[in-house]
């Protein structure tokens, strides 16, 4: 799968899209939660920097919400 690179609390992080649980939009940012070895991690990336797979997950989540 594809890795998503993002900054969280000033720290550079990277997570595999297969570990992402939930995706939603906040303005022009794409926020998500992911499985961080049993804990829930959080992250956000701008829409323009988000990989296509993450945008596809966002589109699917928005469709299911309606």
Curated annotation (Swiss-Prot):
A Pfam match: 7kD_DNA_binding
Gene3D superfamilies, A to Z: 2.40.50.40
SUPFAM superfamilies: Chromo domain-like
N6-methyllysine carried by residues: 5, 7
Post-translational modification: Lys-5 was 70% monomethylated in form 7a, 25% in form 7b, and 20% in form 7d. Lys-7 was 50% monomethylated in form 7a, 40% in form 7b, and 50% in form 7d.
Temperature dependence: Hyperthermostable.
Cytoplasm found in the keyword field: yes
One Gene Ontology CC term in the entry: cytoplasm
InterPro entries: Chromo-like_dom_sf, DNA-bd_7a-e_arc
Chief location: cytoplasm
pH dependence: Highly stable from pH 0 to pH 12.
Location of the protein in the cell: Cytoplasm
Keywords: Cytoplasm, DNA-binding, Methylation
A GO molecular function held by the record: RNA endonuclease activity
Family: Belongs to the 7 kDa DNA-binding/endoribonuclease P2 family.
Role summary: Can constrain negative DNA supercoils. May be involved in maintaining the integrity of the genome at high temperature.
Subunit structure: Monomer.
Remaining remarks: Sac7a and Sac7b are truncated versions of the Sac7d protein, most likely resulting from post-translational processing, or degradation during isolation.
Protein name as annotated: DNA-binding protein 7d
Organism of this sequence: Sulfolobus acidocaldarius (strain ATCC 33909 / DSM 639 / JCM 8929 / NBRC 15157 / NCIMB 11770)
């Amino acid at each position: 799968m594809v890795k998503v690179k993002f900054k969280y609390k000033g720290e550079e992080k990277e997570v595999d899209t297969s570990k992402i649980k939930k995706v939603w939009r906040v303005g022009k940012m794409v926020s998500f939660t992911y499985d961080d070895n049993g804990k829930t991690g959080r992250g956000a990336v701008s829409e323009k920097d988000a990989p296509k797979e993450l945008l596809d997950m966002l589109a699917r989540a928005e469709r299911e919400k309606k």
